[in-house]
Design a protein with these regions (language model features):
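Cytochrome P450
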Residues: 1-384
Length: 384
């Protein structure tokens, strides 16, 4: 279920509609769209109100109907599509794989992937599209490694993941998507017999008897595709922010110890997931002076909430707290991996390419709108 939000996001510029909305308060009613059964819809843009709603899973449901077979197969990997107790059970199986200890064990391999992919990016020659030659390969390979995909399979699977989301040919998107589904099903079956390393192995060893084969394969596919797609969007936007803010890029190159704050500022400022799954009120409740009744639909704008805390991109920001990964029980379980990718990749990019810059005027860049897929730049031509 996708709710069209009442604005058009154009690149990285502020969204003027949100400035106007904030002046009128944190909660707003907007017109019912076709397919919503006449239910009233609400848009929430206030930080405190968004936190309140996202934390209140007892009175707001995030479950949604799924009719498409392909989406149904993917569903176990989309934790925010579930309410407790199913959400609790599925998240408990996945969360240990994202522990701080496992992230640190993964760091050397991520560093290797980043350097190898930047070698490939550089070898193409200036100018080159950063999205195709770095922003997609890096997270796709990281996601494969994280899941426990054998090294010999990673390059081909990474290509299929990218083509399933990025190819301009519908036939190729479909065939690549089916290739990913078939591979993850075989991978899940293999991990049942021999868990080995990676997220799926961790799940099988610790919770394998709690999951059906379909759920295990769905967790594999969902974490693989969503991790790759969202981290690709985030990495490309991060580099775009740096090359369009050269003083900030120079500061990060001179002071790499600022990378943790830089990563958080990128995540806050870009807000590639504009809104989490819409919530449906389960009871009558009052939010910021508005009565929201049972059955009405509430969309929480993470973009509006995060940008309200500062429109300027500043990697030294001290108040970079944000809700880009959500809040409450549906806080993004993959946030540690997304942060680690940026903390490794950004210093490497600015160190290796100190003169990196756009190869086209910024106004010529094209963006994906961010609903339902993450907000992303389609191509990012760079030169040095």
């Amino acid at each position: 279920m996708v709710l069209p939000l009442p604005h058009q996001r154009l690149g990285l510029d502020p969204v003027p509609e949100y400035d106007d909305l904030r002046k009128d308060g944190p909660v707003h009613e907007y017109d019912t769209e076709p397919g919503m059964d006449g239910r009233k819809q609400w848009l929430v843009t206030g930080y405190d109100e968004v936190r309140e709603i996202l934390a209140d899973h007892a009175r707001f449901s995030s479950m949604r109907p799924v009719d498409d077979e392909a989406d149904r197969a993917l569903l176990p990997g989309i934790l925010q599509a579930y309410d407790p107790p199913d959400h609790t059970r599925l998240r408990r199986t996945v969360a240990p794989a994202y522990s701080a200890r496992r992230m640190e064990r993964l760091r050397p391999r991520i560093e290797e992937i980043v350097e190898d992919c930047l070698d490939g990016f550089e070898s193409v020659g200036s100018p080159v599209d950063f999205v195709r030659h770095a922003a997609w390969p890096i997270p796709a390979l990281i996601a494969c490694e994280f899941l426990g995909v054998p090294r010999d399979d990673q390059a081909e699977l990474s290509r299929m993941i990218r083509d399933s989301r990025e190819s301009r040919l519908a036939r190729q998107r479909t065939s690549s998507g089916l290739g990913v589904v078939n591979y993850t099903q075989r991978l899940a079956a293999r991990k049942r017999r021999d868990p080995g390393e990676g997220m799926i192995g961790v799940i099988v060893r610790e919770h394998g008897d709690e999951l059906t084969d379909e759920e295990l394969a769905g967790l594999a596919e969902g974490n693989l595709i969503m991790a790759a797609e969202q981290m690709a969007a985030q990495l490309a936007i991060a580099v775009l922010l740096l090359v369009t803010h050269p003083a900030q890029m120079a500061l990060l190159r001179e002071r790499p110890e600022l990378v943790d704050g830089a990563a958080e500022e990128v995540i806050r400022h870009a807000s590639i997931v504009e809104a989490p799954a819409p919530r449906v009120a389960l009871a009558v409740l009052r939010v910021a002076g508005h009565d929201i009744r049972a059955g009405e639909v509430v969309t929480c704008s993470l973009l509006a909430t995060n940008r309200a805390r500062g429109e300027r991109f500043d990697i030294t920001r001290q108040n970079a707290g944000h809700l880009a990964f959500g809040h409450g029980i549906h806080h993004c379980v993959g946030a540690p991996l997304a942060r680690l990718q940026l903390r490794v990749a950004l210093p490497a990019v600015v160190r290796r390419f100190p003169a990196l810059r756009l190869a086209v005027p910024e106004e010529d860049l094209r963006f994906k709108p961010g609903r339902p897929a993450p907000f992303a730049v389609e191509e990012l031509p760079l030169e040095w």
